Regions:
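Glycine-rich phosphate/adenosyl-contacting loop at the front of the ribokinase-like
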Residues: 1-83, 256-258, 322-329
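Short beta-strand scaffold segments in enzyme catalytic cores
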Residues: 49, 97-101, 238-241
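Conserved N-terminal subdomain of the carbohydrate kinase-like
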Residues: 57-143, 168, 312-329
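Conserved phosphate-binding/catalytic region of the ribokinase-like
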Residues: 1-12, 160-161, 211-329
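Active-site metal-binding loops of divalent metal-dependent hydrolases
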Residues: 15-17, 172, 266
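Conserved beta-alpha-beta core of the PfkB/ribokinase-like small-molecule kinase fold
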Residues: 138-221, 237-239
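Short, conserved phosphate/pyrophosphate- and ester-handling motifs at nucleotide-, phospho-/glycolipid
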Residues: 51, 202, 264
Length: 329
């Protein structure tokens, strides 16, 4: 459990929360599944849990329904070490639920139940905790939070308050079912990118954001859009990170995949860890890649996030992972 008294936050995330209902049978469609596990979910929430597991203070600006699943989310956040001070309760909308199917190694269909909308998309600019946003060491926003009003305006308010401070992160986290079109998503992301310092996404998300799926071209395009650090996740092909001065590419960690859905959020939490600890870019991306790989070997997302000893053990188990470093200027 976490105390209600705290210093300024290390990591403050904003956006999606819900309950993940994942099958306990693999290789079986939902119509034939007979048992499920229930877990805290939502990408920004998972990132906060990942950061908390790595000994950082973390909180989420979000909202849940006034229902059993909402109470579960808040209780589970506290159990996992994440402050729930900024979790609102919406009495009109239910807490979202997400189902998935598990077909390893690379097919994990998702089914989101967030209609007509979700409480986390009803956050308004007045709900933004300005002091927390201003003072957090890392502010982590998600593209999904830009898909509807008033959440879009709330995210813009957070960025206005933040003032492009160091470690203002946009997770490209593109889910097509939440948007009218990819063009609408691109328009929203294009308006926000100049106000963040870090952008992270996979190749498909980069194509939506900047029109490039080639990792190097995507990274350059993100830098040209105004970020200072671009991270392109390539799944089984590794991870690329680039600043104006440096390019780092880390080969993938060899694993047997169970469920890849939480890998990106674990990577994000470890990216936060490296930034907060002042690690080199190569060290940070190596750890982020290893963290993502470790969670991909597990069923769930939030409760699968590694502790620092688990992360270091994973890295020690694979000491020969290729790391390419290049100084660009």
């Amino acid at each position: 459990m976490v105390s209600s008294r705290r210093r300024d936050l290390d990591v403050l995330t904003m956006g999606r929360i819900g309950v993940d209902i994942y099958p306990l049978q693999y290789g079986v469609g939902l119509e034939d599944v007979t048992s499920f596990g229930k877990f805290l979910g939502g990408s920004p929430t998972n990132v906060a849990v990942a950061a908390a597991r790595l000994r950082h203070s973390a909180a989420v600006v979000t909202a849940v329904g006034d229902d059993p699943f909402g109470r579960f989310c808040r209780r589970e956040m506290a159990r996992l070490g994440v402050y729930d001070n900024y979790v609102l309760v919406n009495s009109e909308l239910p807490t979202p639920v997400t189902f998935c199917e598990i077909f390893p190694p690379d097919d994990f269909p998702l089914y989101f139940y967030r209609r007509p909308t979700a409480p986390d998309l009803r956050i308004t600019p007045d709900d933004v905790p300005e002091d927390a946003v201003r003072n957090a060491q890392i502010l982590w926003l998600s593209v999904t939070g830009l898909c509807q009003q008033p959440s879009y305006d709330a995210h813009c308010r957070a960025l206005e308050v933040r003032g492009k401070a160091e470690h203002t992160v946009l997770d490209l986290d593109y889910r097509s079912m939440f948007w009218q079109s990819a063009a609408k998503a691109h328009e929203a992301v294009s308006a926000v990118l100049p106000h963040v310092t870090v952008a992270i996404g996979n190749r498909e998300e980069c194509e939506m954001a900047v029109g490039e799926s080639d990792p190097d071209r995507a990274a350059h395009a993100l830098l040209d859009a105004g970020v200072q650090l671009a991270v392109v996740k390539q799944g089984p092909k590794g991870t690329l990170a680039m600043t104006r001065e440096e390019r780092v590419e880390v080969a993938p960690t060899p694993i047997d995949v169970t469920n890849g859905l939480g890998a990106g959020d674990s990577c994000g939490g470890s990216l936060c860890h490296g930034l907060l600890e002042g690690w080199s870019l190569a060290e940070t991306i190596q750890a982020a890649s290893a963290a993502g790989a470790l969670v991909a070997t597990r069923l769930e997302c939030s409760t699968a996030m590694p502790s620092e000893p688990e992360l270091f053990a994973m890295m020690a188990k694979h000491p020969d992972i290729a790391i390419k470093e290049e100084h660009l200027s």
